[in-house]
Amino acid sequence: RGGAAFVDMDGEFWRDLIDQNLVLTALCGRAEAKAMLAQGRGGVIINVSSGETTRPSPYMGAYGAAKAGINHLTQTMAVELGPSGIRVVAIAPGTTLTEQVRAAFDDEHVAAIRESNPLRTMTEPEELGRLTVFLASDLARCITGQLILADAGAHLSRTRPPNRSPSQ
């Protein structure tokens, strides 16, 4: 449950989305940080944000706001945990060509998403996996507190794919 018209988002809707996204990320990060601090060897915490935080989208206000909270949380965690050798980064995927997306959108809508961004493609789940491995590796040891957009350049685009209301 992520999309609804702004005027239809009641308090329960907001609380559910914030709990599912921001609060759970914070609690998981807390548990990871405590374990890493106890081991004393540093580590990497990778949060999952969303490309929805980079530009407004109809019907995605609560989801985008919750994910934007993850971006700030990531920076705060990086500042607090960095002196202990713990890096914290966030990955912000755009629309990713998962089975769920394939089931939700027809071929025409998927093509419109591809054409609406500079690389004329969509992120594949495997690409997010490779990005995660890189960020967790020593090759990225100087990266912390960053939001890494993995959206085929969609955040740069002036056009958006056709909007779909939550009921479509």
Feature annotation, model-predicted:
Residues 50:
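Residue(s) in the substrate-gating loop at a strand-loop-helix junction
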Residues 34, 79-83, 141:
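Alpha-helical segment proximal to the catalytic Tyr-Lys
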Residues 29, 66, 74:
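Active-site helix of classical SDR
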Residues 144-168:
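Short C-terminal tail/terminal secondary-structure segment
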Residues 2-6, 10-18, 113:
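Substrate-binding pocket helix/loop in short-chain dehydrogenase/reductase
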Residues 4, 56-64, 76, 161:
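Active-site loop-to-helix junction immediately N-terminal to the catalytic Tyr of the SDR YXXXK motif
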Residues 90, 108-143, 150-152:
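C-terminal helical subdomain
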